[in-house]
Amino acid sequence: MKTILVTGCSSGFGREIARYFLERDWKVVATMRKPQEKLLPASDRLRIIELDVTDAASIDRVVAAAGPVDVPVNNAGIGMLNALEGTAMDSAREVFETNTLGTIAMTRALVPQMRERRDGVIVNVTSTVTLRPLHLLSVYTASKAAVNAFSDSLALELAPFDIRVRVVLPGRAPDTRFGENAKPRMAAGFPEAYAGIAKDVFAQWKQESTITRPMQVAEAVWLAATDPGSPAHMPAGDDAVALAAAG
């Protein structure tokens, strides 16, 4: 029985990924900053563990507690929506610490055991904003684009050890907490000069009916984890697939 470790399982994509694999008889290590047992169906194959991907000691504790992991899924992330002028450097660093360096740190901690076994799949969840630039997402996009580049280079590095690396790119997902967890980093102030741009952007988002559902992301992660022939970059969601196809 294989084991998947998923970061950021308190809501959205992470919770659905954990549930999806649990239903398919995998062992699941679901991690989150504030563990809540009731978020996922009770199972003797499920472990819910506290994890802060920006804290080295927290990562070490989780890796030690999890045991052998076949598929780590780096899904934990925080949102950032603001004009660059309105973005405090502390907020920008916070986004990169979680979205980018957190992914690198988790991967670095798990690679040794995978290399020794000469087996495994690393799945990094990024975003289709890396395929098409959008207003007011410059810092967030940069944090996710860095993970794409990291993944592509890492795939070459780990191929001799039979470890695959895959990137799953979801589209817009209003059912997740992206907007909610972006608000604290907007609280410092949104520049008045960009108010018109923001109004137009939000209006456009409301008009878009094609979105990404958490189940579609879970399905893409499943394909990445179980199909050796899966592509290195996998859009997830109707809008994501359409965007990737448009080039």
Placement of each model-derived feature along the sequence:
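N-terminal Rossmann NAD(P)H-binding glycine-rich loop of SDR-like oxidoreductase domains
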Residues: S10, G14, A18
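Substrate-binding pocket helix/loop in short-chain dehydrogenase/reductase
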Residues: A83-L84, S91-R93
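Active-site loop immediately N-terminal to the catalytic Tyr-X3-Lys motif
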Residues: E85, R132-S138
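Active-site helix of classical SDR
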Residues: T107, S143-A146
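A short, exposed helix-loop element centered on a Lys and neighboring polar residues
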Residues: T107-R108, D152
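Residue(s) in the substrate-gating loop at a strand-loop-helix junction
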Residues: S127
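SDR active-site lid
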Residues: P160-S230
